[in-house]
C-alpha cells in the first residue's frame, strides 16, 4: 500500500515531527538554562520555603503573588517542581491551581518535568493529582525516559497502574527504543508485565538492538516472566539484529531454568548469531556451568564445526576452568584449532584453546588443558614465547613439563640463528635458567661467522663491506646471537648473560665480536678463568647423558625418575642447582 494513502501513517509522521520540534526547543532551552532565569524575589523565596516546610496557610497567601510563581532558581526549578516532590497532596493542589498551564510541562535544567519528578520521588498521589488536572502523561525527560518507564524502573505497580488509567502510551519507545515492557522484563516484575499486556502492551516490541522483552527476560534470568511472555505469544525463535536467539540471550544470563524452558518450547541450541557463536559458546565464555550442562546435549557437533571454534576455546578465553573440565569430560577435543577466518582476525593468528589460557596468564586453565593433552606447539606464535614474554614462571614451567618446544622460532618477528625464546629472558636470570635447564640449545648462541671454533677471527671480504658498510651477510640472512646481544641498548647484558650460558656448555667458542664486548664487562675475569680451564668430568658426563636422553624425556620428571641412578645424580642431570624458580617454590 502507498504510504501517502495511509491516514494512520500520516498521523504518526506528524506526531513524530511535532515531538522532534518540541524536543529541539526544550534542548535549546536547557542549553541556555543559566541565562533564562532572573534573580529570585523575596516572595518567591518565601513561597518555596512554605512548600518545603509544609506550611499551608502561608502558602495560600504567597501564591497570590503570580510573579513569584513564574520565577525559577539556578537549577531551573519553579515552585511547581518543588511542590511535586514533597508528600503533602494539598500543597501540590494549591500550587498547581495557582500556576499557569504553560508551566505544567516546563523542564528543569536537568530536563525533568513536574510529572517525571513526581514519579522519581515515588509519590503516587502526586502523580495522580497531576494526571487528573490534565498533565500530559507521555512527555519524556531529557534522558528520553517517559513517566511510565521511570515508574517501572522504580518498581511501583500502583504508579504504573495510575499512569495506564490516564491513557499513557504503553509502547512509547525511549532511548534506544527501550520500552516499559523491556524494563519490566529486565526487572523481573511479572505483575507489571501482566498489567501492561492486559491493557494492550505489545509482546513483540523490539529495542534498538532488535531484542524483544522475551530476550530481555531470558538474559536477566527471570524464568516466571519468560514463561508468562511465552504464554502471551512471545516468539521463542525471534532473533535480534545481531542474529542472537532468545536461547543465546538466556545462555548469557546463565539461568538453567530459563534454558530448560526455552528448549521445552522449541528453542534450538544450533542457531548461531551473525558472528557464528552458538548458545553453548556464550555459556562457556561467561562461565555458566549449569547452563552449559543443558546446552551440551542439545548442540550438534556439526553446528559447532561450522561455527569455526569450539566451546573449549570460549571457556579458555573466558577463564572458566570448571566449564573447561565439564567440556573435556563430555569429549570435546582440547586440540581442535580455530577456523582460519577466526584465527586471522587476531594479530597473533592464534589457533588453540591453550593459547587463550596462556595469553590470559590463566594458570588454572592452562593446567587443565595441558593435563587433558593440549599440545603446546600448534600455534604460529608458540605458547611458550607468549608465557616467557609475560614473565609468567609457572605457566612456562607447565608448558615445558608438557613438551613445549624450548627451541622454537618465530620468524615473523626476528630471523635469528638462535631459538627465539631467549630474547625475552635476557634480563631475568630466573627465567633464563628455567629455559636453559629444560634443554634450550645454548650452543646456537655461539654459532656465528665472526670466528672459527678456535677463536681465530674471520675477516669479511671488502666487497661485502662495500655493499653493506658496517653489516655482514649473516645479519641479513639470520641474525647471530653475538650481533643481537651487542647492540648499544643491550650491550650491558652481555657479561651477565654469557656467564649464565657457559654453565650449560662444555666448550665455548667465543667469536671476536663477542669477546671484544665481554672484555669491558665486570664478569669478564670470571668468564676468562672458566674458559681457560677444562670442564669437570662430572659436568661433561651430565651433558652427554642429557644429549642421549633427548629433550622430550628430560622435560618429563617421570622419565628421569626411572633412571637407575641415585636421586642426587638425577637432580644433577636436571641442573637442579640452577633451578632458581624451583628453589623459590621449594620444588627442588
UniProtKB/Swiss-Prot annotation:
Residues 524-579 form the SOCS box domain. GO terms for cellular component: cytosol. ANK repeats lie at residues 110-142, 143-174, 176-208, 209-241, 242-274, 307-339, 349-380, 381-413, 416-444. The keyword Repeat applies. Keywords: ANK repeat, Repeat, Ubl conjugation pathway. InterPro entries: Ankyrin_rpt, Ankyrin_rpt-contain_sf, SOCS_box, SOCS_box-like_dom_sf. It comes from the Eukaryota. GO terms for biological process: intracellular signal transduction; protein ubiquitination. Pathway: Protein modification; protein ubiquitination. Belongs to the ankyrin SOCS box (ASB) family. PANTHER family: ANKYRIN REPEAT AND PROTEIN KINASE DOMAIN-CONTAINING PROTEIN (PTHR24198), ANKYRIN REPEAT AND SOCS BOX CONTAINING 15 (PTHR24198:SF187). May be a substrate-recognition component of a SCF-like ECS (Elongin-Cullin-SOCS-box protein) E3 ubiquitin-protein ligase complex which mediates the ubiquitination and subsequent proteasomal degradation of target proteins. The SOCS box domain mediates the interaction with the Elongin BC complex, an adapter module in different E3 ubiquitin-protein ligase complexes. This is Ankyrin repeat and SOCS box protein 15. It comes from Homo sapiens (Human).
Amino acid at each position: 500500500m502507498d504510504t501517502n494513502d495511509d491516514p494512520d501513517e500520516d498521523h504518526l509522521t506528524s506526531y513524530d515531527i511535532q515531538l522532534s520540534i518540541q524536543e529541539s526547543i526544550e534542548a535549546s532551552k536547557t542549553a541556555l538554562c543559566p541565562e533564562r532565569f532572573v534573580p529570585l524575589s523575596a516572595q518567591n523565596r518565601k513561597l518555596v520555603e512554605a512548600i518545603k516546610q509544609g506550611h499551608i496557610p502561608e502558602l495560600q497567601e504567597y501564591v497570590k503573588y503570580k510573579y513569584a510563581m513564574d520565577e525559577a532558581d539556578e537549577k531551573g526549578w519553579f515552585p511547581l517542581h518543588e511542590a511535586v516532590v514533597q508528600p503533602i497532596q494539598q500543597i501540590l493542589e494549591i500550587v498547581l491551581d495557582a500556576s499557569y498551564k504553560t508551566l505544567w510541562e516546563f523542564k528543569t535544567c536537568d530536563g525533568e518535568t513536574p510529572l517525571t519528578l513526581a514519579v522519581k520521588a515515588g509519590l503516587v498521589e502526586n502523580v495522580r493529582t497531576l494526571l487528573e488536572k490534565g498533565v500530559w502523561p507521555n512527555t519524556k525527560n531529557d534522558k528520553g525516559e517517559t513517566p511510565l518507564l521511570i515508574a517501572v524502573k522504580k518498581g511501583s505497580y500502583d504508579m504504573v497502574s495510575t499512569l495506564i488509567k490516564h491513557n499513557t502510551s504503553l509502547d512509547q519507545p525511549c532511548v534506544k527504543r527501550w520500552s516499559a515492557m523491556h524494563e519490566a522484563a529486565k526487572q523481573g516484575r511479572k505483575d507489571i508485565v501482566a498489567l501492561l499486556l492486559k491493557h494492550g502492551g505489545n509482546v513483540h516490541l523490539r529495542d534498538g538492538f532488535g531484542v524483544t522483552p522475551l530476550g530481555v527476560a531470558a538474559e536477566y534470568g527471570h524464568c516466571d516472566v519468560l514463561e508468562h511472555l511465552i504464554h502471551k505469544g512471545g516468539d521463542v525463535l525471534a532473533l535480534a539484529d545481531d542474529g542472537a536467539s532468545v536461547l543465546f540471550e538466556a545462555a548469557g544470563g546463565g539461568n538453567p531454568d530459563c534454558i530448560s524452558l526455552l528448549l521445552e518450547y522449541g528453542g534450538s541450541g544450533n542457531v548461531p548469531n551473525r558472528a557464528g557463536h552458538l548458545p553453548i559458546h556464550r555459556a562457556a565464555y561467561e562461565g555458566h556451568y549449569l547452563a552449559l550442562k543443558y546446552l551440551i546435549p542439545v548442540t550438534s557437533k556439526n553446528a559447532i564445526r561450522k561455527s569455526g571454534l569450539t566451546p573449549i576455546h570460549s571457556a579458555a578465553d573466558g577463564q572458566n576452568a570448571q566449564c573447561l573440565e565439564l567440556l573435556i569430560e563430555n569429549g570435546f577435543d582440547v586440540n581442535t584449532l580455530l577456523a582460519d577466518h577466526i584465527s586471522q582476525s587476531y594479530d597473533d593468528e592464534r589457533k588453540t584453546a591453550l593459547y587463550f589460557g596462556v595469553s590470559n596468564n590463566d594458570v588454572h586453565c592452562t593446567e587443565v588443558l595441558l593435563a587433558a593433552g593440549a599440545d603446546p606447539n600448534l600455534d604460529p606464535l608458540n605458547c611458550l614465547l607468549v608465557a616467557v614474554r609475560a614473565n609468567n614462571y609457572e605457566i612456562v614451567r607447565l608448558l615445558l613439563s608438557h613438551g613445549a618446544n624450548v627451541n622454537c622460532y618465530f620468524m615473523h618477528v626476528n630471523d635469528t640463528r638462535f631459538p627465539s625464546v631467549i630474547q625475552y629472558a635476557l634480563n631475568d636470570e630466573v627465567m633464563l635458567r628455567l629455559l636453559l635447564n629444560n634443554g634450550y640449545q645454548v650452543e646456537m648462541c655461539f654459532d656465528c661467522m665472526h670466528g672459527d671454533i678456535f677463536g681465530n677471527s674471520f675477516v669479511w671480504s671488502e666487497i661485502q663491506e662495500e655493499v653493506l658498510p658496517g653489516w655482514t651477510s649473516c645479519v641479513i640472512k639470520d641474525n647471530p646471537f653475538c650481533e643481537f646481544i651487542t647492540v648499544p641498548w643491550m650491550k650491558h647484558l652481555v657479561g651477565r648473560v654469557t656467564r649464565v650460558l657457559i654453565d650449560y656448555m662444555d666448550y665455548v667458542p667465543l667469536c671476536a665480536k663477542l669477546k671484544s664486548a665481554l672484555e669491558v664487562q665486570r664478569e669478564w675475569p670470571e668468564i676468562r678463568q672458566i674458559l681457560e680451564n677444562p670442564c669437570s668430568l662430572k659436568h661433561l658426563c651430565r651433558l652427554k647423558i642429557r644429549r642421549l636422553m633427548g629433550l622430550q624425556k628430560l622435560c618429563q620428571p617421570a622419565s628421569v625418575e626411572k633412571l637407575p641412578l641415585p636421586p642426587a645424580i638425577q637432580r644433577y642431570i636436571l641442573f637442579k642447582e640452577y633451578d632458581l624458580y624451583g628453589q623459590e617454590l621449594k620444588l627442588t
